[in-house]
């Protein structure tokens, strides 16, 4: 009986630590996007979704929106970004995939996309604050929730410091023209 209690206790804390680690990686990737990809040189940050701690005490309805809302400083166009970081790809080449959006998230983001464009930023590999690859795919091109294959993300890859180490990180911000071209591949 005591052994079962200890096992349950171990599983509970293992999952708790695993979830905390996953959330931390997500936060680091979000910081990377704001600091290096969607820089204040090109974009104003209009909205940042509440963290889980705020929602624990009182649920904030706007938490159902994507993580960020930006405004292009050149054209004044507004758009949303949902950030997803995954440490590694699952499956074997050439059919590698990641799990990334639930059905309800995809439905919500497609509704938001009817008013303002929604992009899903997917970071993979290396560290969350400096991923190997970053993909920025308009949600309107995502047909199925839960998992997405690497081969479907490749056309939406953006340059980053890992891919081009000779570049300085501040030179790798995503210019607005490159952002808007993604809507018309």
Language-model regions, residue ranges each:
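Mg2+/Mn2+-dependent nuclease catalytic core
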Residues: 86-112
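Acidic carboxylate-rich catalytic motifs and surrounding loops in phosphoryl-/glycosyl-chemistry enzymes
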Residues: 49-52, 120-128
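A short acidic/basic microdomain associated with nuclease active sites
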Residues: 35-71
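N-terminal targeting/trafficking signals and adjacent low-complexity tails
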Residues: 46-50, 85, 93
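Non-catalytic C-terminal interaction segments of nucleic acid-processing enzymes
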Residues: 1-9, 17, 21, 28, ...
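Short glycine-/polar-rich loops that comprise or flank the Walker A/P-loop
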Residues: 114-118
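Conserved catalytic cores of phosphodiester-cleaving nucleases, focusing on short active-site segments
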Residues: 37, 66-91
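Conserved alpha-helical elements of sugar-nucleotide-dependent glycosyltransferases
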Residues: 25-33, 105
